[in-house]
């Protein structure tokens, strides 16, 4: 199984138990607000806002909450002013970690991130220290039960498919150039093919395989980072083998 597909599988398992809905809604509201502030409140002309709204709706956020977040972004309602800051560093086993945040207090945020990294044996680095190891891509998961691999590839090639990973037992992972995420989503929608987790992702060039001890520490660190108040997304280049995952699940 490729590192990206394996990590996607791990994240799905984690999401079922780790993500508190209130915390998730807070992150989604921030993303909608920032997207509306940067590109306007009309999702038809603002792909980032449209993606944020789609994600919020997929997670059962009420439309009232979505509309309020948009209006805070456009200035129609008062709200906090968020600044987007990306932090980079190293975690257990030497894995590279990128933390994307949205904050109204950068001093608080960097202190929180540094504390979480250092207590787990990691370290916060300078901007660019690990970012060069990753590429930003569009990412979509398509259930294997919905379509064959050949048919999916044929459907999406002209829309902007860059890579199709099929190692996961339940999902294909569709990777696109950033600019092609929306056309690929549209192609799936028009063909009435279900999909999940359409998002911008950071895909590492190479992966670092962890042993049981480092994997345990790394998963704990990423959980803590993902659940910190200001983190919007966390990416890493860690790879965890099936045997290590099985050992962790038995603990």
Curated annotation (Swiss-Prot):
InterPro entries found in the cross-reference section: Integrase-like_N, TACO1_YebC-like_2nd/3rd_dom, TACO1_YebC_N, Transcrip_reg_TACO1-like, Transcrip_reg_TACO1-like_dom3, YebC-like
Any GO MF annotation of the entry: DNA binding
Coiled coil stretches, renumbered: none
One family name in Pfam for this protein: Transcrip_reg
Gene Ontology CC terms, in alphabetical order: cytosol
Keyword set, alphabetical order: Cytoplasm, DNA-binding, Transcription, Transcription regulation
Keyword Transferase belongs to the record: no
Origin superkingdom: Bacteria
Subcellular localization: Cytoplasm
BP GO terms, sorted: regulation of DNA-templated transcription
Primary site of residence: cytoplasm
Recorded family membership: Belongs to the TACO1 family.
Protein's name according to its UniProt entry: Probable transcriptional regulatory protein Cpar_0525
Organism of this sequence: Chlorobaculum parvum (strain DSM 263 / NCIMB 8327) (Chlorobium vibrioforme subsp. thiosulfatophilum)
Lineage of the species this protein comes from: Bacteria, Pseudomonadati, Chlorobiota, Chlorobiia, Chlorobiales
């Amino acid at each position: 199984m490729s590192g990206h597909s394996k990590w996607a599988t791990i994240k799905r398992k984690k999401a079922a138990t780790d993500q508190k809905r209130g915390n998730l809604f807070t992150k989604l509201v921030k993303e909608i607000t920032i997207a509306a502030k940067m590109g306007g409140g009309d999702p038809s002309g603002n792909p980032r806002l449209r993606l944020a709204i789609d994600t919020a709706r997929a997670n059962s956020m009420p439309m009232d909450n979505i509309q309020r977040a948009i209006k805070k972004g456009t200035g129609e309602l008062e709200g906090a002013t968020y600044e987007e800051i990306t932090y980079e560093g190293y975690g257990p086993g030497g894995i590279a970690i990128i933390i994307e945040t949205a904050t109204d207090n950068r001093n608080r945020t960097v202190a929180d991130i540094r504390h979480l990294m250092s207590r787990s044996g990691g370290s916060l680095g300078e901007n660019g220290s690990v970012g060069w190891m990753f590429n930003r891509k569009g990412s979509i998961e398509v259930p294997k039960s919905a379509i064959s691999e050949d048919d999916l590839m044929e459907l999406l090639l002209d829309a902007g498919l860059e890579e199709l990973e099929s190692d996961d037992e339940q999902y294909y992972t569709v990777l696109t150039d950033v600019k092609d995420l929306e056309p690929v989503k549209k192609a799936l929608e028009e063909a009435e093919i279900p999909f999940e987790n359409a998002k911008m992702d950071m895909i590492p060039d190479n992966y670092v395989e962890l042993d049981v001890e480092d994997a345990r520490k790394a998963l704990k660190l990423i959980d803590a980072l993902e659940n910190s108040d200001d983190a919007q997304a966390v990416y890493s280049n860690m790879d965890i083998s099936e045997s290590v995952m099985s050992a962790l699940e038995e603990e």
